[in-house]
Amino acid sequence: GSEMCIRDRGEGLGYYGLANNIAMSVGPMVGLFLHDAYSFEVIFVCSLISCSLGFAMASLVKAPVKAPVKREPVSLDRFILVKGIPAGVDLLMLSIPYGMTTTYVAMYARQIGITHGMGVFFTLMAVGMAISRIFSGRQVDKGRVTRVIAWGMYLVCLCFFALSSCAMLMRLNETLSLWIFFGVALFLGVGFGTMFPAFNTLFVNLAPNNQRGTATSTYLTSWDVGIGIGLLLGGYIAQISTFDKAYLFGACLTVTSIVYFQWKVAPHFERNKLR
C-alpha cells in the first residue's frame, strides 16, 4: 500500500485484500478435497509447493529503495500504529467469527446434517469476495472508507445470525436451511471482501508516509490475532455446547464491533486521518 498513488490506493489495497481473503476461502476448499481424496502427506506437499511458488513470485517484485528513517532505538510505534489501536480492536472482534467460519463451518455443516457441498460453500465465499471489488474499491477512493466498512459490518452481522439459525431451521425446513446456509457463504464473502480491504485503507490513512508499513502490519496483526482467537473460542464453545452457539457468539461479537465502530473508531478516524 505504501507504493501506490493516493488516488488509487483504496482500489489497490482492495485487490491486495481480495487476494488475501480469497486465499483464506480457497485454502479450506482445496484442503477438504485433498483430505477426502489423498493422505496428509499430499496435503503438506501441496502446501509446500504453494508456498514455494508464492516465494518465487514475491522475489520478482521490485520496489524502489528508500532511505532509512531515523527513529528511537526502541519505541512502540516501530511495531504498532498507536493511532490505529481502536480500529485494531474492532477488526480483531470481526476476525474472530471469520476464523470460526474458515475452520469449523464444515464440522458445523455435518453436525446439522449437511454432508455434501462444503467445496461449494467456500467457492461461493470466494465469489462473494470477488463481487465486492466491483464497487468497494472505488467507494473507498472517493473517501467513503467508514461508510464502506459499515456496509460490510451490517451484512456480516446478518449473515452470522442467519448461519447460527441454520441448526434450528434444519429441523423445520431442510430446503430453506440449505438455501440460507449457502446464501450466507456468498454474502459473507461480499461483506468481508468489502470490509477488510477498507479497514486496511483506514489504517494507512491514519499513518504518516514513513509509517505506512507499520499501519499495514497493525492491520494484519489484528486480523491474524482475531483469527487465532476464533480458532480457540470456536473449538471451546463447540466442545461445551454446539457449533450454532459458537456462531451465535460470533454474531453477538459483530454487533459489539458495530457499536464500537460507530461510537469510537469512525469518529477517531475522522479526527486523525491524514489523507
Ranges and model annotations:
Residues 155-173:
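C-terminal ends and interior cores of transmembrane alpha-helices
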Residues 132-144:
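Helix-to-loop junctions at the C-terminal end of transmembrane segments
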Residues 1-3, 194-207:
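Intracellular juxtamembrane helix-capping segments at the cytosolic ends
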Residues 63-91:
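Juxtamembrane intracellular "pre-TM" segments in multi-pass secondary transporters
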Residues 48-67, 260-264:
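C-terminal membrane-cytosol helix-exit motif in multi-pass small-molecule transporters
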Residues 15-59:
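Helix-loop-helix hairpin linking two adjacent transmembrane segments in secondary transporters
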Residues 142-153:
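Cytoplasmic membrane-interface "Motif A"-like loop-to-helix N-cap segments
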Residues 1-18:
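Cytoplasmic helix-loop-helix junction between adjacent transmembrane helices
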